[in-house]
């Protein structure tokens, strides 16, 4: 490793490594480089490095976020950063119909936020951050308000199964793709995870309806980039990276074991 700002530690499980870097962009560049070199691996959601004080109290890194945003998007930015434990420290008028915001926010509150910020501001917002120091832990953050659509069976996705599934949310796959139990195939429109069978075919009958021959229309799937996939995955999910594909999966693939772990 020639990158002095990158630290790699072997975990107790010899199949996994803990990789520490300078932020999401730094780690995503490493992932993309490894992918291009032919590696296949899985990554978890990025985490910050915590410290403890002399009394054993948990401390976390805090950053100052400087934001310039068109006036009409000020409300949504303040709301989203508030949900991520951000505290508005300053607010003023900037040039050309822009508002300048200054937030104090935990570093983990910014994980996965920049893509969301660009969407919320229609690409017109500017965000810069600087490290402030370590402060007492601010409490849990809910990174995602929408749950996942999870494949229930292993097989190949078919139009009929996907047609039923797309009513539940946004799909990440189209027909003819290999799926396996525990694989995330889309984003739910609601907060909870839903298991779906996208491999199911329509039962054949002797009767025909007037619309029997009409092709089922599927909404084109949302194809996630590496950055979008890293932003999307939740703490109980992994991103599988191969030279040709990106797949999101639950850490625990078995449905029963997954539900059992959630009850603990």
What feature does the model see in each segment?
Residues 1-264:
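Accessory interaction regions appended to the cores of large information-processing enzymes
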